[in-house]
Amino acid sequence: MEHVDSPLYLGLMSGTSADGIDAALVRFADDTHRRCELVAGTTVAWEPQLRETLVALGQGAETVAIDALGQLDAQVGLAFAAAANQLIGDSGVERRQIRAIGSHGQTIRHRPNASPAFTWQIGDASRIAEHTGITTVADFRRRDVAAGGQGAPLMPAFHLAMLGAGDEDRAVLNLGGIGNLTLIPRDGAVRGFDTGPANALLDSWCQRHHGTPFDADGAFAASGRVDAALLQALLADPWFALPPPKSTGREQFHLDWAVQAMGNARLDAADVQATLLELTAASVADALLRLQPTTRRVLVCGGGVRNPVLLARLAARLPGAMVESSARYGLDPDYLEAMGFAWLAAELLAGRAANLPSVTGAAGPRLLGAIYPA
């Protein structure tokens, strides 16, 4: 990409799986921010005990004292700052070239349907700015919630900017801890919504029964068989039938939710893994066929893109669409969300609204994020 002297932006993201902090250095082609290049990226693993605490908090499994939560907010902020500093050091770029950091933080609770609604991400942005020396933009979701929106998903605006449909109806599928779809028709408004559990349940079940943090290449799931009764019980959750806009998280779709659906059935662990994988494929395909049946291309990003068994099941359920990695269009699937938060920071500093009311249900376009100066 040209314009090598244009400023860089650094995006930081840790999703519902809390499997690591993704950091991405991004350069935009011009001030429209409609073309971008990944200059460098890295993923920094969470310290195991800290990750355990974050996962437990994220699924609503425990409460925490205010003092402990304040310290956790600081710890997460320091971890994000360390990830940014590691990427800067590894990439060799000069700090002065980076105009801003966009930090998503770590979601510990997402309750868009509560009264009043709220969403909560921790990771003290003041500490990120202090320990990197770079202006930091954070707290992207709460303004959309304040405007009556779900506060999620936020990536559809970025997907539209980078992967606009052109001459076909297409979708962008992020397979993180939770799955979410962006529907980009040739004509008409973009829509986006969460589809339900993805890696979060698969990883948790694999950790419980294999002692490994994820199912490498989907091998554990491939060794089992889908249990039709369990799949039906899981899909019977009323959330799946809700129309968009909708969003969810570990608070709703956690491992105890799946175990409860099993009842007294004595199932092989591999069969459960196969069924959880099929749940992800089915929930995505059902939503896509219901809401944009003319989709011809599904561009996949997030950790799930490395699960060939999951991609094969998606392709089988979507015979009319090409299912492929976003890498085909020059956007690294491992860092697409981190790149998206770099983009959100750039959009705020440019004074442009970055939510899509057609996606989140907000009352209108809003500037997203708060600025923490260096």
Swiss-Prot record:
According to the UniProt record, which cysteines are disulfide-bonded?
A: none
* Catalytic activity, EC: 2.7.1.170
A biological process (GO) of this protein is: amino sugar metabolic process
> Which keywords does this chain's UniProt record carry?
ATP-binding, Carbohydrate metabolism, Kinase, Nucleotide-binding, Transferase
Output the Gene3D superfamilies linked to this UniProt entry.
3.30.420.40
* Amino-acid positions noted as binding ATP in the UniProt annotation, renumbered to this chain: G15, T16, S17, A18, D19, G20, I21, D22
Give the pathway listed in the UniProt entry for this protein.
Amino-sugar metabolism; 1,6-anhydro-N-acetylmuramate degradation; Cell wall biogenesis; peptidoglycan recycling
* The keyword Transferase appears for this protein: yes
Q: What Gene Ontology molecular function terms does this protein carry? A: ATP binding; kinase activity; phosphotransferase activity, alcohol group as acceptor
Q: What does this protein do?
A: Catalyzes the specific phosphorylation of 1,6-anhydro-N-acetylmuramic acid (anhMurNAc) with the simultaneous cleavage of the 1,6-anhydro ring, generating MurNAc-6-P. Is required for the utilization of anhMurNAc either imported from the medium or derived from its own cell wall murein, and thus plays a role in cell wall recycling.
Give the record's family classification. Answer: Belongs to the anhydro-N-acetylmuramic acid kinase family.
Q: Name the PANTHER family for this protein.
A: ANHYDRO-N-ACETYLMURAMIC ACID KINASE (PTHR30605:SF0)
Q: What is this protein called?
A: Anhydro-N-acetylmuramic acid kinase
**Which gene underlies this protein?**
anmK
